[in-house]
A protein has these predicted regions:
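Outer-membrane beta-barrel translocator domains and adjoining extracellular loop/strand segments
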Residues: 1, 36-41, 64-74, 103-108, ...
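Internal metal/ion-chelating core segments
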Residues: 1-44
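Residues that define the transmembrane beta-barrel architecture of outer-membrane proteins
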Residues: 3-7, 34-38, 51, 74-78, ...
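Outer-membrane beta-barrel "beta-signal"
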Residues: 8-9, 130, 168, 172, ...
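Detector for outer-membrane/organellar transmembrane beta-barrel domains
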Residues: 14, 41-152
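Short loop/turn motifs that connect adjacent beta-strands in outer-membrane beta-barrel proteins
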Residues: 15-22, 47-53, 137-144, 175-183, ...
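A C-terminal functional module that forms or caps the active site or interfaces directly
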Residues: 137-182
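Transmembrane beta-barrel domains of Gram-negative outer membranes and organellar outer membranes
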Residues: 186, 190-191
């Protein structure tokens, strides 16, 4: 499978609507003797008073081809993000439904729900998630951002264990003499209905710089 070439064709188009900004994304991938994938996503957004509302539905299909070296595959995933931004806050509800087979993503992620540890990918899985993010710039704390992100992952009883994941993240981007430096801390708790629960802690240090002029 690793030696199979991948062919990709994509397009993005901004529709000429003023009241509701609309961006259409369409991609098709072909991996010989593995699978074909088609992915479509539409981004809608509009401002009502001081609130920005947005809706991002998406649909993905995957079907094995040729020698099926990645295994038999015939599945889909659809879902959406529905949210609102106001005064530095961004609240989003996310929903995803996956078809009969687990989604295969060897080169990237087009899944609807992507959390710190898990993502919407299992066969016959339904995911409901809620994310609350806040940019503290409105409070005079430039560069400070945080979010809490909860997801509930459910599958049929004979397909595996239901579980939930809770994420917490805080990040800070420095300015002035330390411009380009960023710190980030993330913490996740995963709670399985059947199985061992665990926590995941991550720390990041980033530094962005340019070479030359």
């Amino acid at each position: 499978m690793a030696d199979n070439p991948v062919y990709a064709l994509g397009a993005k188009y901004q529709l000429p609507f003023e009241a509701v900004k609309t961006e259409v994304n369409l991609w098709h991938y072909r991996m010989e003797d593995v699978f074909n994938q088609t992915y479509a996503k539409v981004k809608f957004s509009t401002d009502i008073s001081a609130v920005n509302f947005y809706l991002t539905p998406s649909y993905l299909t995957q079907k094995a081809t040729g020698d099926e070296t990645g295994g038999p595959l015939d599945t889909y995933q659809y879902g959406f993000h529905l949210g609102a931004k106001f005064a530095g806050a961004d609240i989003t509800y996310l929903y995803a439904k996956t078809g009969d087979d687990t989604v295969l993503t060897p080169w990237g992620d087009e899944k609807v729900v992507i959390q710190q540890v898990y993502q919407s990918a299992r066969a016959d899985e339904e995911v409901n998630a809620l994310k609350l993010a806040y940019d503290f710039e409105k409070l005079g704390l430039n560069g400070l951002e945080a979010y809490a992100y909860y997801g509930q992952y459910d599958v049929p009883e004979n397909a595996g264990s239901d579980f939930s994941e809770m994420n917490y993240s805080i990040s800070y981007k420095f300015s002035g003499a330390l411009s380009g430096l960023g710190l980030k801390a993330r913490y996740a708790t995963i709670d399985f209905d059947q199985g061992e629960n665990f926590n995941d802690v991550r720390f990041y240090i980033n530094y962005k710089f340019t070479l030359g002029h």
